[in-house]
Amino acid sequence: MLKDFSRSMRLERSLYKEIAVIIQKNLRDPRLNSFITITEVKLSYDLSYAKVFITFLNYDDKKNIKIILGILQNATGYIRSLLNKKIYLRIVPKLFFVYDTSLINGIFISELIKNI
């Protein structure tokens, strides 16, 4: 028998969807000219913190990655206020944006395998 999804997994999925919509439609910062993709959301055990793993196209240098992460981190209050209107929680988790390197690592490994 399949195990039912836990509350934290359901909440991670809801946060994943809502944060993606908020970033694409509600953030109007001109410095965010890249297509930002959320790859995963991980909640802490007590549901008070959420790590949002993101990746974006055409920005491989660390300087631009830091700039975009800083912009998103500064917008967490606004994002949390919009989340509070869409997802009914007693406490909306504090958001921490982290650049996800799994895509770059996967491309690197694929290139290594191709060159063998």
Curated annotation (Swiss-Prot):
Domain of life: Bacteria
Presence of the UniProt keyword Cytoplasm in the record: yes
BP GO annotations: maturation of SSU-rRNA
Places the protein is found: Cytoplasm
PROSITE patterns: RBFA (PS01319)
Pfam family, one: RBFA
Annotated TM spans: none
GO MF terms, alphabetically ordered: ribosomal small subunit binding
Major localisation: cytoplasm
GO cellular component: cytosol
Keywords noted in UniProt: Cytoplasm, Ribosome biogenesis
Assembly, per entry: Monomer. Binds 30S ribosomal subunits, but not 50S ribosomal subunits or 70S ribosomes.
Protein family (similarity comment): Belongs to the RbfA family.
Stated role: One of several proteins that assist in the late maturation steps of the functional core of the 30S ribosomal subunit. Associates with free 30S ribosomal subunits (but not with 30S subunits that are part of 70S ribosomes or polysomes). Required for efficient processing of 16S rRNA. May interact with the 5'-terminal helix region of 16S rRNA.
Protein name as it appears in the record: Ribosome-binding factor A
Species: Buchnera aphidicola subsp. Cinara cedri (strain Cc)
Lineage: Bacteria, Pseudomonadati, Pseudomonadota, Gammaproteobacteria, Enterobacterales
Gene symbol of the encoding locus: rbfA
